[in-house]
Amino acid sequence: MEAPAPAETAGCEELDMDVMRPLINEQNFDGSSDEEQEQTLVPIQKHYQLDGQHGISFLQTLVHLLKGNIGTGLLGLPLAIKNAGIVLGPISLVFIGIISVHCMHILVRCSHFLCQRFKKSTLGYSDTVSFAMEASPWSCLQRQAAWGRQVVDFFLVITQLGFCSVYIVFLAENVKQVHEGFLGSTPIVSNGSDLSHACERRSVDLRVYMLCFLPLIILLVFIRELKNLFVLSFLANISMAASLVIIYQYVVRNMPDPHNLPIVAGWKKYPLFFGTAVFAFEGIGVVLPLENQMRESKRFPQALNIGMAIVTVLYISLATLGYMCFRDEIKGSITLNLPQDMWLYQSVKILYSFGIFVTYSIQFYVPAEIIIPGVTARLHAKWKRICEFGIRSLLVSITRAGAILIPRLDIVISFVGAVSSSTLALILPPLVEILTFSKDHYNIWMILKNISIAFTGVVGFLLGTYVTVEEIIYPTTAVVAGTSQSPFLNVNSTCITSGL
């Protein structure tokens, strides 16, 4: 992906907070109508417009869509292909990608319809679900419409904090490999004792690296305004783009004979594929905020189709080529398969880790701004800032605890994807369309289509959760990504790698 010009990129990054804000403030929407907003309401076939001073451009929207969908999930897709098969995997990725994009379009269409029906200028995800329940023909749902908003907010918080836990595991595993690769290339002065030599080379537990990142991440999330992260965010985007280019050239240049790869993997592993794939495609949370902020919102479907087409091609190509290159040795992140004795490929892990480190603060923004205002609302002004920093530190510690409990990158990605991403991306949007249009625009084919999509999401949710939990409790492998996955630190060990 070609990097945008610095001036326009600056505009993109400075708008990050404004783009994310509708995701935060929607639960405080008072439901009152505005006369000026009411006068600007137009038929459903048309779209509202923002002036050039406040809206974001088509290119900025496209960049934000790419940023919202490209992360650690992309690097975990080669292992997902292994869990599905070299033929079934790519086909399933196309299928899940098409359904995910369709659900994004569903959400935008329902938001437009409900905006006009309830005379609102814009609606976010939570309010779209709430007003869809209010517009439904069933009185029991109408009375519980407020619960729709709370359910979406809950899954948004769980999803974003889950992303943050994934990032901590990713950072720890990649930095661990770089550190051990550096130690492995450094001559060691030995007294001739094999035991001493073994102790020098013994690996540090993955959780120690997680602990080292904790204060750095806490300091990062103390930056309350995303626009203040512009320079870091811009450098992070460049770093991740450069890393992907290097990864592509490696897998293409080192491609073995692709024969003898399983066309279809065992069915017990397919739920792990589903969780990882849905995790990767779960960018639905940024769709309505972006559409609401776009200057020419009538062009948003075009931006969505172009952006997600790029994302899907990127996903399928890297997933397939990565699995064909590393075969059964593929790990939870393809970066962990790159050579440890060449600094070009070690730099990929450093660069991508830097990008993920900065992205942590962006993903953390949503749950922090949903939780913190409700907790600090009744506090005295002088205590609010202290309490806010305490809550931010606590939330970061919670994400680290989640990473410690599930220190396997592949499993934590599949678990978050199955539990929360499938709910937001596949289950809720088709149900929202049924609730929104069943009263005035009843269509049996629309009902059947949406029930099928929601059923797929529910099955993936149940099977994916079951298989990942089973894998957590009864792991099939004792060593993942080259690190011991024992449930606790070996505090009795007397041999710890130096240089940490």
Curated annotation (Swiss-Prot):
A molecular function (GO) term: symporter activity
Any one GO CC term of the record: lysosomal membrane
N-acetylmethionine PTM positions read: 1
| Cellular location(s) | Lysosome membrane
Q: In which tissues is it expressed?
A: Highly expressed in hippocampus, hypothalamus and piriform cortex (at protein level). Expressed in epithelial cells and both inhibitory and excitatory neurons.
Q: Which domain of life is it from?
A: Eukaryota
Q: Per the UniProt annotation, where are the glycans attached?
A: 492
What reactions does this protein catalyze? L-tryptophan(in) = L-tryptophan(out); L-alanine(in) = L-alanine(out); L-proline(in) = L-proline(out)
Membrane topology, as annotated: Multi-pass membrane protein
Q: Which GO terms describe its biological process?
A: L-alanine transport; tryptophan transport
Alphabetized, the UniProt keywords read:
Acetylation, Amino-acid transport, Glycoprotein, Lysosome, Membrane, Symport, Transmembrane, Transmembrane helix, Transport
The regions listed as transmembrane in this protein's record are 84-104, 151-171, 203-223, 228-248, 270-290, 306-326, 354-374, 411-431, 444-464
Question: Would the keyword Glycosyltransferase be found if you checked this record's keyword annotation?
Answer: no
Q: Which residues form a coiled coil?
A: none
Q: Could you describe the subunit structure of this protein?
A: Interacts with CRYBA1.
- Which PANTHER family does this one have? AMINO ACID TRANSPORTER (PTHR22950), NEUTRAL AMINO ACID UNIPORTER 4 (PTHR22950:SF190)
Q: What does this protein do?
A: Uniporter that mediates the transport of neutral amino acids like L-tryptophan, proline and alanine. The transport activity is sodium ions-independent, electroneutral and therefore functions via facilitated diffusion.
As for family, the record states:
Belongs to the amino acid/polyamine transporter 2 family.
Q: What is this protein called?
A: Neutral amino acid uniporter 4
Origin species: Mus musculus (Mouse)
Protein encoded by which gene? Slc36a4
